[in-house]
């Protein structure tokens, strides 16, 4: 695999980038007086909806997820290396494995929780979970499914399924890193893993859980040792970790975040948002690179963010959120620095 394998792909992406909603369009959506106005604004976008659909959160979600699934299918077809897309589709694969194994374990119908996004079909994953074998998926994935099922059988707790597949997911990310073999994706993978650990510790603290619980919830696949991160958070020194992520310019958003870290006021939900902001800014600053997988990843991360923002704004309107409440919760807009 060479960086030049992505040249034609990146040209295609540069054309499709024009379909992202602009800052002006976002302002118009936020200022729209009624659903008819919103419907008019969304015409000729991938998110076209009627005024009636815009009054129904379930209908909104259907349109948004249809577009997300379409995007992933298109990118899997477009990318010369499917592992690049898997960096972000794998979260859905492991979510589906959790659901399918819980269906097997409990006999309950949880099929509405399945999300058909990923390299492997729902049918392939279902066969894997039910038979503990597959000629389609990675051998390492077969091993992880077998191990997780064995742990469930030993403890008879569905929590074992969640813990088992969480660990497997991060091991999978590191496997993808090796397969992609491009040092430019390392900061992305480190961010996905390290932020998970930081958020796990913060959530444990918010629930008044001890260190043993924290260690159990964390993964050893991070770039920073578990105990170091725990010490940073407990001592309000998390900015020591975050400021070492020197792959982005530290504008006002990140300066505000580090201040909250030093004051010990940063919450788990705020860290989730910070992770998204970091990935956005990292990929934004690499926007002039014409070779390699980062252009494709920037598009994918941008699409995920746009759909999150639309979900917030469109369902927020249904639920009566004020404009200020929506804007303060929105993530970054594609093509802009933060």
Regions found by a protein language model. Give the residues of each.
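N-terminal domain-start signal
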Residues: 1-338
